[in-house]
Amino acid sequence: MRNVDAAGLGIGDDYPPRLMGVLNVSSESPYKPSVFDEPDEAAAYVDGMIEEGADIVDVGLESANKRYEVLTAKEELERLDVALETIASVSGDAVFSIETRYHEVADEAISRGFDMVNDISGFADPEMPRVCADHDVAVGKMASPPDLERPGAVDDVDWSVRRSPAWAEQASYVDNVYESLRLNGFTDKTILDPAFGGWSERKTLEDDRETFRRLREFRGFGRPLLVSINRKNFLREVAGRDTDGALPVSLAATAMAVERGAHVVRTHDVAETRDAALIGKEFARRRVRDPGDVSVEELDVTTAAEARRHLDRLDADPAAADGAVTRVFEFEGLAPEDREALVAAAADTGAVVAPAETGALLAGSPAALRDVAASAAGSEALAAALERLPVGDAY
């Protein structure tokens, strides 16, 4: 996993989770507590976030809400002075990020005091990577189509043209997000954002929930991950909460996101989110990381789909993913002949069966378990149980 240096702030597996507080100088922003148009008031708000634990402050010049017309680069530049006056008045120490989709705005902001860029259009402006690389700054890249006016709308891309009809037919929403992050490449200091939130009319809350379930897959890029999940609808709906009551679900999801590999959490609730992120980091899996002459890193892989993402990055055979993960299942209520059938079926597959008095423990790779299911010569009840094993591509 590549670490990123953002103006001296380390981001990645070797560092604590980083908190990105939010300041908006756009009156259109839907979250009014973070909106300021007076630099002194804005600076006081930012100092408060820094005291609460914000490592990064993300400054938005316009609302990303799809209900509003997109500002031009010229209009964003007209709002930049307020943002610059604000950061000049801040007494606390933080990395300042400018949220923009335009390379002209990024160039001006970095030249005049900002430390990094947060591009919600995913390098739809083809000059954005060059500007960020020339300034040697970190840049957040959100999954997005190559369209400056439709950030995050990855399900609006015609993937049958961009990839192939066959690929598009079998691809899931998460596959679309993953492919969108590939578009237009990366800089050496790119941080990836899988675009949680209502970025298009076609996107569903379940799309976001599935992306969250499969968050570890995005570690396959080998780059730090940024998540923006604070009080989002896909979490609120689970618990039946409105925005004001959504802090507890946001904190629960924050701990889970960090445990699953997120490195930066964007939030309006800095103090509370800091604690949740630290809990997630504390209970994340401890993995081998040895940077010797021949480096060794244990990957955080729990499914074949996650393994396949890493194999893709390495340009290695994706078929190896089927043997990269072990699944363990307990069977109960097996007749003696079914226990014997399991043992016999597993003998030549690489799976392991540990028979017990009325059941058995079955362990193996998804490929081995599929072979067991195909060859076991037991009862109809055993065949039905084996057929229900979740050992397809997503597992």
What are these regions (language model features)?
Residues M1-S26, R285-D322, A341, E387-Y395:
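N-terminal amphipathic alpha-helix/helix-capping segment at the start of soluble metabolic enzymes
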Residues R18, Y31-K32, F36-E38, A44, ...:
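Active-site-adjacent loop and "lid" segments of alpha/beta metabolic enzymes
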Residues L23, M49, G53, V117, ...:
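Conserved, mostly hydrophobic/aromatic
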Residues D40-V57, S89, D93, D107-M116, ...:
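Alpha/beta enzyme core
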Residues D55-D58, S97, M116-N118, G140-K141, ...:
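Conserved beta-strand positions in the central sheet of alpha/beta enzyme cores
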Residues E179-E206, L311-G323:
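Active-site rim beta-loop-alpha module in soluble metabolic enzymes
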Residues A319-A335:
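Short glycine-/aliphatic-rich beta-strand segments at the starts of folded cytosolic domains
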Residues V353-Y395:
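C-terminal functional modules
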